[in-house]
Each structure stands twice: as structure tokens, then as C-alpha cells.
Amino acid sequence: MKGILFFFFLLPLLSHPQTIDNHFKIDQIGYRPNDKKIAVISDPQTGYNAPDPYTPGATLELRRESDHVVVFSGAPVAWNSGATHAQSGDKAWWFDFSTVTTPDDYYINDPANNKRSY
């Protein structure tokens, strides 16, 4: 019995909940099944949000919200060879998950940084 109680007290310390992060820009309304689906990931360089940098990991995942199963994974691609966008002051990456055509609720997960989209 003591072992079971110890496990339940230890479990919250072992789990690492993912942080919902606003660096992922996705269509909040959704995508039609055969549409091009691209998320934009931003890394602020200048401006009000510059103190909140973010560089995505080498591989991002698209996960189904209901059971958190990975349905697609791929590498983010640097926008404009990694240049900073003059108007926004951000560097950006594109994450194309257009091959996913099954309607459902999904989120983008960055396992290297333990962050996810809304």
C-alpha cells in the first residue's frame, strides 16, 4: 500500500506537461481536407516580444487531440533562408502538414522543447 501511495505522489513530479506556446501560428478555424496546411513558427528578434525567443526542434509532430497520437512528423523549414522579416522583426519557419487529410482536431508538438500549439 505504501508503494502505491508513493507512486501517486511521485507521478506529478515525473510527468512534464507540455507548455502551450504562442510561437505557433495556425488557422484557428481549421483547414479543409485537401487544402494546403502550413503552420508558421516565429522567433522574435526585435520588437516588444524579442525577450521571448524560440527555436523549434529539428522535428515537429502533428498529434490528434483526442489521444495525442502522432499522425505526422517532419522538419520545420526556415523561411527566406533564416532571414529576419523586416516588418515583424521575426525569424520564421514553415511546417507543412498538407498530407494529413483526415478531419479531426490536431495540435503541433515540439518534443525537443516540450511545447505545443493551441
Label each residue range with its predicted role.
Residues 1-19:
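Bacterial Sec-dependent N-terminal signal peptides
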Residues 20, 24-118:
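Ligand-binding face of N-terminal immunoglobulin V-set domains in extracellular IgSF glycoproteins
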